């Protein structure tokens, strides 16, 4: 089993963890339907930037 040679300080540990924070997803509201969706993604009913791009 691997064992560290020297103890890592709180500062080094926290600097490593500084990139682990999660960000909230950018959500938009569709112009035509008012439905919320992820930015740069098609809505569930097939609209993207006010245009119907997928026919169901």
Curated annotation (Swiss-Prot):
HAMAP family referenced in this protein's UniProt entry, alphabetically: Ribosomal_bL32
Region (Disordered): 1-37
GO cellular component: large ribosomal subunit
Protein family: Belongs to the bacterial ribosomal protein bL32 family.
Protein name: Large ribosomal subunit protein bL32
GO MF term list: structural constituent of ribosome
Keyword terms, alphabetized: Ribonucleoprotein, Ribosomal protein
One GO-annotated biological process of the protein: translation
Regions of compositional bias (Basic residues) in chain numbering: 7-16
Entry-linked InterPro entries: Ribosomal_bL32, Ribosomal_bL32_bact, Ribosomal_zn-bd
